Regions:
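Residues forming the flavin
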Residues: 1, 80-234
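Ferredoxin-type iron-sulfur electron-transfer modules in oxidoreductases and energy-metabolism complexes
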Residues: 1-2, 21-54, 70-97, 219-220
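General structural signal for alpha-helix termini and helix-helix connectors
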Residues: 4-7, 44, 48, 62-66, ...
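A ubiquitous short alpha-helical element
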Residues: 7-12, 46, 149-152
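Iron-sulfur cluster-binding cysteine motifs and their immediate structural context
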Residues: 7-32, 53-83, 129, 133-136, ...
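Proline-rich intrinsically disordered, low-complexity coils
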Residues: 11, 23-24, 49, 57, ...
Length: 234
C-alpha cells in the first residue's frame, strides 16, 4: 500500500489531517524499509499513532487523490498502525527523560485530549499529574470504544510508557472547577464531552432505551471483569 502513494505535489491527505500528519513522507520511508525513520516522521506530528491507526475516521484517505480518482485510496490509517506496531516490536519506542523546568501542571481528564496534553507538557519539562474521575485511565478511549476496535491493552501499553517518562496518573479523582487540586502552577482542563445529547422523540421514555455511551461503558467494564448486578445491566 505504501508503494501506491504518489507523493502528490498538492498533498490533500496532509491538508485533511487535523494533526498535520505527513503521509507521503512516512509512507515513502515505510516502502523503502526504513521503519525507524517512518516512525520518527509519524510521531513528529502524532503522539499516539496506535490509537489513530485503529479508530481515526481517516480524513486523509477520504482526501487521497486515488480515492477521488478511482475510489481506492491508499490505506494510510492501516499503514500508521503497521508503523507504530513495528516500532514497539523493534524497540524504537523507549521511555525518555526530559530536562525539568521546575513547574508543575495538573491535567484534568485522561481521554485523548488529556493524554496528548500530558505527553506534550511532559516533553517540555513540566511535572505532570493526570487526574481521572473514573476507575481506569483512558476516558472514552477505554469506556466508549469496544475492544474489537481498540484493545485496552493498547491503552495500557502507552500509559506504561508515559508513567516511565515521569507522568503521574490518579484515578477515582472527583474534581470540579471549585475543587481543583492544590500545589500546581497551572491546570489543563481536558474533560471531553461525556454527556450524551438527549432526544425529545416519541418512545424516548420506554423501558430499554439507553444512550449508546452508557451501553458501551458498561460492556467495557464487564469485559474488564467487573461484576454488574443483573438488574443494572443494559
Amino acid at each position: 500500500q505504501a508503494s501506491r502513494c504518489m507523493d502528490c505535489g498538492v498533498p490533500f491527505c496532509h491538508w485533511a489531517c487535523p494533526l498535520g500528519n505527513r503521509p507521503p513522507e512516512f509512507q515513502d520511508a515505510m516502502y523503502k524499509g526504513k521503519w525507524k525513520e517512518a516512525y520518527e516522521i509519524l510521531t513528529g506530528t502524532n503522539d499516539f499513532p496506535e490509537f489513530t491507526g485503529r479508530i481515526c475516521p481517516a480524513l486523509c484517505e477520504k482526501s487521497c487523490v486515488l480515492k477521488l480518482s478511482m475510489d481506492a485510496p491508499v490505506t494510510i490509517r492501516e499503514d500508521e498502525a503497521a508503523i507504530i506496531e513495528a516500532a514497539f516490536r523493534e524497540g524504537y519506542v523507549q521511555p525518555r527523560q526530559y530536562e525539568r523546568n521546575g513547574k508543575s501542571v495538573a491535567v484534568i481528564g485522561s481521554g485523548p485530549a488529556g493524554l496528548a496534553a500530558a505527553n506534550q507538557l511532559n516533553r517540555r519539562g513540566y511535572a505532570v499529574t493526570v487526574f481521572e474521575k473514573l476507575e481506569y485511565v483512558g476516558g472514552l478511549l477505554r469506556f466508549g470504544i469496544p475492544n474489537f476496535k481498540l484493545s485496552k491493552s493498547v491503552i495500557d501499553r502507552r500509559v506504561a510508557v508515559m508513567e516511565a517518562e515521569g507522568i503521574t496518573f490518579k484515578v477515582n479523582a472527583d474534581i470540579d472547577v471549585t475543587n481543583l487540586p492544590e500545589g500546581f502552577d497551572a491546570y489543563c482542563i481536558c474533560t471531553g464531552t461525556p454527556q450524551a445529547r438527549d432526544l425529545n422523540i416519541p418512545g424516548r421514555e420506554l423501558k430499554g432505551i439507553h444512550f449508546a455511551v452508557e451501553m458501551l461503558a458498561q460492556q467495557n467494564r464487564v469485559l474488564a471483569g467487573q461484576h454488574i448486578p443483573e438488574e443494572e445491566r443494559i
